[in-house]
UniProtKB/Swiss-Prot annotation:
Enzyme class at the top of the EC tree: translocase
Alphabetical list of CDD domains matching this protein: P-type_ATPase_Cu-like
Chain positions recorded as Mg(2+) binding sites: D565, D569
Protein name: Probable copper-transporting P-type ATPase B
Transmembrane segments: 32-52, 57-77, 95-115, 127-147, 284-304, 315-335, 623-645, 649-671
Matches recorded under Gene3D superfamilies: Calcium-transporting ATPase, cytoplasmic domain N, Calcium-transporting ATPase, cytoplasmic transduction domain A, HAD superfamily/HAD-like
Length: 674
């Protein structure tokens, strides 16, 4: 199977709000041009009211040609609207298609009556038909829908581009070393594929041979090329920049990064937010409003003028000018655009409600390590406090216990011990002490690695001056305990991310208060916070403390956004009004988090808030346009200003209706991230 085409198809079909529209109505472009062939002679052979031409196209029997061509046009060109109206009524959700179907049906049926009266009745006088209005009406509707479908398609353009990134085939390295080109669908997990410079990486995987720079701009929005070496992860769909590499496949098909992103975005687009449910409800009421106004205007004009032609024209114009569709598409089109732009830039919107809530956020709470800082620790100091143990022995004991952990602090210690050629052993019975550290057996002795809070809580002695000095330098400090005695310590420094300071400044400029939550000691937390400009700091926290702090802030009616690790901070992310999982990488399917930030870049927090602001502004613009248009257009179509000579024909009504939807679509398409 061609993954690219399949994903593209799945994405397109997911535009649920409009897919029915596209589904029943075939190719509007073809229908428009075929209908144009029928419409031209209908218009030329019909008497154009108020237009005096120096020549006539009519001939004896031409009215029969008009009747036949109009009938063909009604059933062929009008079929999308007739079948669409039928489906809307069947689902008990009458809307734009039903209004258009009613309008063209009234025009056609009355024209049949007029044809009979003019050709077979003994009644004197001429009854005006609506054949040329019918022709122009159907033509304009088809043209409008053709343009609209293009605009709707473009709304999710960024996501479509992502869907097309995967190649159709890959070079598989066989067990005997031979290379063979195979379809993407034939690639399995653990296969080895070879990717040359300039080629698209076919699947997610790990580099097992070679090194290169990868262009991930179309996949995650990362503008700079990323250097990749052996054992580094690569994402399917990114471009191999400089060298030939061999990649061991780790995920294929639906498990791949791009497929996961497409699935999450499709799900988000199909879920309706509260604002969209409201607009759908209003759009539903608009149908009944338009029909009521149309019928009332027909009755009123019959009473005023006793002119069935004019009264009927008002009815048809009201039916075709009303556009619940503009209101119904106001939010889905913006959503399709914003979610696809977000995905294209590494911002995966899982919960659409969070885009609306983001406008009201009061606090952004952030974990320190990995969110505000790099999380790449370096050992700056280690020391033994026991005379019979050397500094390197203390380092060995630390490394032995930490070798069983994947925490950034632990990885840093193990790597440092290796770089110093300090040997360490495999401990036994290693257990995690939540919010504190580790404990385990080494040579039948129990050791614990703890933080300073543990020492204070258990009243264990330590060098307070040394701790203060190292902590104020921004070091995270861990202690080694044997038999309730502190026998050693290690201090590790972390770098503040380049974009963290600007992110904090941007939050403050938006009147949003940044809050640091960390399990680290007070001195380190405040040192980092001071450098970043954060005044609200909570340090030495246990994992469950973060959730309770968020709850406390919310109890005063504040809206809280939490940014942290999608796994370790899961309870906090769920508790917050908006949970943002940062640095998810290819694991975008993390359960917690309303928003997934693929990269570990604090700037993306601001990018999300900006995208949210821009999205809501476009939604409001579209809703005002969709509602305002109908409030003005429907009374005009009914003839409320006829006394000053302002009368809209059905054709003008059709043009305005089509334009109203096209304007909504184009406005959605102009949504940008920045």
């Amino acid at each position: 199977m061609n993954h690219s085409n399949q994903m593209h198809h799945d994405n397109h079909a997911s535009h649920d709000h409009h897919s029915g529209h596209a589904h029943h109505h075939g190719n509007f472009k073809v229908k428009f041009f075929v209908s144009l062939i029928f419409a031209i002679p209908i218009i030329l052979l019909s008497p154009l009211m108020g237009v005096n031409l120096p020549f006539q196209f009519t001939f004896p029997g031409s009215e029969w040609v008009v009747l036949i061509l109009s009938t063909i046009l009604f059933f062929y060109g009008g079929k999308p609207f007739l079948s669409g109206g039928k489906d809307e009524i069947a689902t008990k959700k009458p809307g734009m298609m039903t209004l258009v179907a009613l309008g063209i049906s009234v025009a056609y049926i009355y024209s049949l009556y007029a044809f009979y009266m003019n050709n077979f009745s003994s009644a004197t006088g001429h009854t005006m038909d609506f054949f040329w209005e019918l022709a122009t009406l159907i033509l304009i509707m088809l043209l409008g829908h053709w343009i609209e479908m293009n605009a709707v398609g473009n709304a999710g353009d960024a996501l479509k581009k992502m869907a097309e990134l995967l190649p159709n085939s890959a070079i598989k390295v066989m067990d005997n070393g031979q290379r063979e080109e195979v379809k993407i669908s034939d690639i399995m997990t653990d296969d080895i594929v070879e990717v040359k410079a300039g080629e698209s990486i076919p699947t997610d995987g790990i580099i097992v041979q070679g090194q290169t720079s990868i262009d991930e701009s179309l996949v995650t929005g990362e503008s700079k090329k990323v250097q990749k070496n052996q054992n580094d992860n690569v994402i399917g769909g990114s471009i191999n920049g400089s060298g030939t590499i061999q990649v061991k496949v780790t995920a294929v098909g639906e498990d791949g990064y791009l497929s996961q992103v497409m699935g999450l975005v499709n799900q988000a687009q199909n879920d309706k937010s509260s604002a969209e449910l409201l607009s759908d409800k209003v759009a539903g009421y608009l149908f009944y409003f338009a029909v009521s106004v149309g019928v009332i205007s027909f009755i009123v004009w019959m009473l005023i003028q006793n002119d069935v032609d004019f009264a009927l024209e008002r009815l048809v114009t009201v039916l075709v000018i009303a556009c619940p569709h503009a209101l119904g598409l106001a939010i889905p089109l913006v959503t399709a655009r914003s979610t696809s732009i977000g995905a294209h830039n590494g911002l995966i919107i899982k919960n659409r409600e969070s885009v609306e809530i983001a406008q009201h956020i009061d606090y952004v709470m952030m974990d320190k390590t990995g969110t505000l800082t790099e999380g790449n620790f370096s050992v700056n100091h280690y020391e033994s406090f026991k005379n019979d143990l050397s500094n390197d022995t203390i380092l060995s004991l630390f490394a032995s216990l930490e070798s069983q952990s994947n925490h950034p602090l632990a990885i840093s210690i193990v790597d440092f011990a290796k770089s110093k050629n300090v040997s360490f052993t495999n401990p036994q019975d290693v257990n995690n002490i939540p919010g504190v550290g580790l404990e385990g057996l080494i040579d039948n002795k129990t050791y614990k690695i703890t933080n300073v809070s543990y020492l204070d809580k258990h009243k264990l002695n330590y060098d307070d001056d040394l701790f203060t000095k190292l902590a104020q330098q921004g070091n995270s400090i861990s202690y080694l305990i044997e038999d309730q005695q502190v026998i050693g310590m290690i201090a590790q420094g972390d770098q503040i991310k380049e974009s963290s300071k600007q992110m904090v400044a941007d939050l403050l400029s938006r009147n949003i208060t940044p809050v640091m939550l960390t399990g680290d000691n007070n001195e380190v937390a405040h040192a980092v916070a001071k450098e970043l400009g954060i005044s609200d700091v909570h340090a030495q926290l246990m994992p469950e403390d973060k959730e309770s702090i968020i709850k406390d802030y919310q109890s005063d009616g504040n809206k809280v956004m939490m940014v942290g690790d999608g796994i370790n901070d899961a309870p906090s992310l769920i508790r917050a009004d908006i949970g943002i999982a940062i640095g998810a990488g290819t694991d975008v399917a993390v359960d917690s988090g309303d928003i997934i930030l693929v990269k570990s870049n604090p700037s993306d927090i601001i990018h999300f808030l900006t995208l949210s602001n821009n999205t809501m502004r476009k939604m409001v613009q579209n809703l005002w346009w969709g509602a305002g248009y109908n409030i003005v257009a429907v009374p005009l179509a009914a003839g409320i200003l006829a006394f000053i000579g302002l009368i809209l024909s059905p054709a003008i009504g059709a043009i305005l209706m089509s334009l109203s939807t096209i304007i909504v679509a184009i406005n959605a398409f102009t949504l940008k991230l920045k």
